[in-house]
Amino acid sequence: MGTLGKAREAPRKPCHGSRAGPKGRLEAKSTNSPLPAQPSLAQITQFRMMVSLGHLAKGASLDDLIDSCIQSFDADGNLCRSNQLLQVMLTMHRIIISSAELLQKLMNLYKDALEKNSPGICLKICYFVRYWITEFWIMFKMDASLTSTMEEFQDLVKANGEESHCHLIDTTQINSRDWSRKLTQRIKSNTSKKRKVSLLFDHLEPEELSEHLTYLEFKSFRRISFSDYQNYLVNSCVKENPTMERSIALCNGISQWVQLMVLSRPTPQLRAEVFIKFIHVAQKLHQLQNFNTLMAVIGGLCHSSISRLKETSSHVPHEINKVLGEMTELLSSCRNYDNYRRAYGECTHFKIPILGVHLKDLISLYEAMPDYLEDGKVNVQKLLALYNHINELVQLQDVAPPLDANKDLVHLLTLSLDLYYTEDEIYELSYAREPRNHRAPPLTPSKPPVVVDWASGVSPKPDPKTISKHVQRMVDSVFKNYDLDQDGYISQEEFEKIAASFPFSFCVMDKDREGLISRDEITAYFMRASSIYSKLGLGFPHNFQETTYLKPTFCDNCAGFLWGVIKQGYRCKDCGMNCHKQCKDLVVFECKKRSKSPAVSTENISSVVPMSTLCPLGTKDLLHAPEEGSFIFQNGEVVDHSEESKDRTIMLLGVSSQKISVRLKRTVAHKTTQTESFPWVGGEMPPGHFVLTSPRKSAQGALYVHSPASPCPSPALVRKRAFVKWENKESLIKPKPELHLRLRTYQELEQEVNTLRADNDALKIQLKYAQKQIESLQLGKSNHVLAQMDHGDGT
């Protein structure tokens, strides 16, 4: 970043696509050098082309331009003059006339030459068409009307018995030529040495991250063809332009990914660490001369959802803020991106421009200059200016990037950047992290200072097959790097670290084997966690309905009490989440639908099962909890009063996917104490603690459970309090001991694990028995239906 100051001291040089104002000219004259500023390379190229065109550069009719192109070939098909007019005419003719109409004019000239018995002219016309097919074959593959007209031209030539001419205008060679694979060929790295990189976001160095982002950016940028730029000029949008739309979507995806990665950290210190890391990534991107991704990263860091985080910014050093200010000034839109244009003009070799800025230049040039001059001639200078501008962007695709990308990390980034959120959703997440106050609703997000307008409103249009392909590639990379014993499983700890590379994940992992995750489970996880998947209608939104609660209930979003006589709040019919009316639209937890088992809602529980029936969340083949921090009780069981059931241990799976072991003893409390104050009323709840208590519990029975910070905390927003609702019929008859928490020995933990495993095995046996009964009943039902049908046929 030390070069930014020097760049500001350098005299300004006029660059293409922008007009130097009076102030810029005065500054150029006030330098010590008596010589005027040197023209840019694009200006020199345009001047040389105008000289080579001669009188045509001042303007010419369309027929004169076509005739000059035909006369550029000799009798043997070789160019007898500069090919610059051919290049300009064949690439930019769509501004004046469509490709099919241009070929139709050539057909008419061919017919006239046949009538005048001029075989030389016919041959030159075919040479011109062959040059068109060879150099700009993509037009014949993308333009259906041009292909249809070409077939008519070929039939015309065949009808006149000109076999040699038919070979010249043959288009079957398009699919067999090597250059037809230009758009899909791989990027060649400058280094042959293979290096192993980590797939964990926290372990990735800024240099590695910037190189792989540059790889993805260049891969998308080099697929934009000359025709794509033409289509953008003609349509003034990226509609029906998939390559350019994907490039824009990648830029927006990187910007949103940066915001969400910062917001995914639960504490201001951790958010500041991610913020600082992306500043270092931006510095590396500037060194790589990747201005487009640099714009996306800085735009994400300057977004209002990040800049409003005052607590986070207080942990960012002054030096980092200074670097951010320099980057923001470099990419500022002031004076038509003057700082960026000067820095970009000084770059040589590999560089990726800010595509939006140059597309705006193309549109400005296209709208400012007329297509025709006053005498009806074609404005050749406009065609030249547009051609030079587009050709400069296309030539950048031939310079290989100075980096070596890791395929596995590319797959991981490709999937993680596919996440898509709206501006309002991101701002709600920011507001949930650092609320301004408890009453004010979230404001409408403001535009970031460095994000260009052309990129807004462009959303990716994926399909399930594309998402599935990205997920499968990423999963293959994960197991290749982390499944060293090749048993088809990775550990829970490794998975949590890998999942930290994704901004927000909303589902709890099931495990076929304790502490291990299979390939199918991790694939299902990322398919479900994909935000685009949710946008396709396959997500899990809440189904809130206004509800009247018969018992005191708390809001699962803000932990506040639901006041009122009737219709106190809203309840999700699928997962059972309760919340205030004002909290309904602020809930960021994904709906986790409950399995249709004979479970009883928390409002209607009249009996409690032994504590051994409580099962840990995330354990496969057991009851699935509807949401984090809640329990499901089976109905119809008899309360066991043995010593074994009085003192049990349950396993809670917190929002960071780490297990919290809690030793509980059965307790009772009067049901009228739900709204009494807790010991910390008037102060803040102790940090690092979850609150586990019954809503019917008195203040003396509050239980504190220490929860150490996870090395890779989950991005899911932590609720202020989690309540376990349970009660006992005997609570009105005989009081029981209070809830108790103590540290346990290793032997006790081992005994508890063995007990839980035995309970798990017993439940599996019961489940298999129930499944067999269901199958037998279904078979009996089918036989009964068939018997009735046979009886009906007999009668």
Curated annotation (Swiss-Prot):
Instruction: Kindly list the positions at which Phosphothreonine occurs in this protein.
Output: T184
* SMART domains assigned: C1, EFh, RasGEF, RasGEFN
How its function is modulated: the record gives: Autoinhibited. Activated by diacylglycerol and calcium binding, which induces a conformational change releasing the autoinhibitory state. Regulated by DGKA. Regulated by DGKZ. Regulated by PLC gamma and F-actin polymerization.
Tissues showing expression: Specifically expressed in brain with higher density in hippocampal CA1 and CA3 fields. Detected in interneurons and projection neurons with no restriction to any neuronal type or neurotransmitter phenotype but not detected in glial cells. Expressed in the hematopoietic system. Expressed in several neuronal types of the hippocampus and entorhinal cortex (at protein level).
- In terms of superkingdom, the source organism counts as Eukaryota
Positions bound to Ca(2+): D483, D485, D487, Y489, E494
Q: Which PANTHER family match?
A: GUANINE NUCLEOTIDE EXCHANGE FACTOR, RAS GUANYL-RELEASING PROTEIN 1
The protein, known as: RAS guanyl-releasing protein 1
